[in-house]
């Protein structure tokens, strides 16, 4: 029996139902590195997964980076579930609606390769994984599988998926995606974090790490001065205002229809919204794994329907 593993291949992080790690990848060639944490051995080469951030790839299939990160994600999820390292897997992944039809065949082929099973070692454990199927679903909309009641409560709503590089927008009418309204803004969390880092450097001369900025944006502990914290919070509010303005300019009236916000940036916006923004209604699906969970539920639902035919 095969297992379903949902994977959200973000620009900023790779997420499964139980794991999340940065989408960075460092190649060490044939030389084993100093660490076993995140260490992937594949094809006679060594890679450390989750180390920092890699350059933005608009086409994730141009090299093997996201395939290697997929293997790491499978290994991490299998370990979390307590499953054997030799098993069959069905991958449920996603793409933005703005590029869904164009990129779906290529991304599916990229993840589903002919050489099966896939043999690799991750953090010292040998894996033999047979990838039986790869199913691709629309990002954001699939995440609503985790909160199906939302689709029944409102005739129209705006879905805002705040990812690492882009914020994907789409209106949903009577529980059906209005595909012609799909729009993508390059205002994801990478942009937010980079702008904050630059502003802190400009005002204080300090160079913050991504992790420090992320913690402060989430309201978590971080040893910095009150001045730095104030700059970060001010920039978080500025980012939120910019995002709301860009969304309105894209043709979505946030004063008239409810908005469902999800993805890694949703928690930032939730902490920096103000009553003076005058939004109709905001619903937050917090947690960076909702897309991955939604992909899994979507594939499970498709499988059930097929078995009933």
Protein language model features and the residues they cover:
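Conserved blade-register residue in beta-propeller folds
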Residues: 16, 169-171
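Nucleotide/phosphate-binding catalytic cleft detector across ATP-hydrolyzing
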Residues: 1-157, 176-191, 203, 210-309
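Ser/Thr-glycine-rich phosphate-binding loops at phosphate-binding pockets of nucleotides
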Residues: 162-168
